[in-house]
């Protein structure tokens, strides 16, 4: 009987050919991307759990994932895995009475590019989830998310800006804020001794 999907069979055959360099490249990439799982503490952490990120909706709690700065380059993939697991758990319709959830992604640039973060910022709002992304400046945000960097700002419920030390960030938010002339009234009362 003839194969109904010859194109698929040919593509798959390229991976099963022992002389194929493609399968070696795929395996090499997978091993590199999963190397953080070799760390004994991470393996132990991931081996079992009594926690479900869905509990963020039903119980008042705060969850912290902290990786020392000197370990971020090695374990950012682990942080990405945890953030993705959280997104997956919260991407279901909330039940009546479920709490709102705030996910604070401080130093989000350390996670590198995550397509799911771009989608989650817009989509999870409908599931009672707010994502608060913290970047150092617009250059950092744009270098990671390229042409999609403004999605973070346009989908944000609130944008906070502190100490703009680079010109691009200062100009961007100055233009967004527009012109405003304010007035203030003050009243002082003074008394002098001996009156």
Language model features with spans:
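P-loop NTPase motor domains
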Residues: 1-130, 144, 154, 165
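P-loop NTPase motor core of the ASCE superfamily
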Residues: 54, 119-122, 140-195
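H-loop/switch region of ABC-family ATPase nucleotide-binding domains
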Residues: 135
């Amino acid at each position: 009987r003839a194969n109904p999907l010859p194109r698929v069979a040919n593509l798959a055959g390229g991976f099963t050919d022992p002389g194929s360099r493609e399968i070696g490249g795929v395996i090499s990439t997978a091993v590199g991307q999963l190397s953080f799982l070799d760390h004994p503490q991470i393996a132990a952490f991931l081996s079992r759990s009594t926690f479900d990120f869905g509990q963020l909706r039903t119980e008042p709690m705060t969850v912290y994932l902290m990786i020392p700065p000197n370990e971020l380059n090695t374990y950012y993939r682990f942080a990405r895995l945890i953030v993705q697991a959280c997104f997956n758990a919260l991407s279901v319709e909330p039940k009546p009475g479920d709490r709102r959830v705030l996910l604070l992604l401080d130093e989000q640039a350390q996670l590198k590019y995550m397509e799911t973060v771009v989608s989650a910022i817009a989509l999870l709002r409908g599931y009672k989830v707010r994502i608060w992304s913290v970047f150092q400046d617009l250059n950092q945000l744009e270098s990671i998310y390229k042409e999609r960097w403004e999605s973070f700002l346009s989908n944000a419920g609130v944008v906070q800006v502190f100490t703009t030390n680079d010109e691009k960030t200062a100009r961007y938010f100055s233009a967004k804020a527009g012109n405003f002339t304010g007035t203030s009234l003050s009243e002082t009362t003074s008394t002098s001794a001996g009156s």
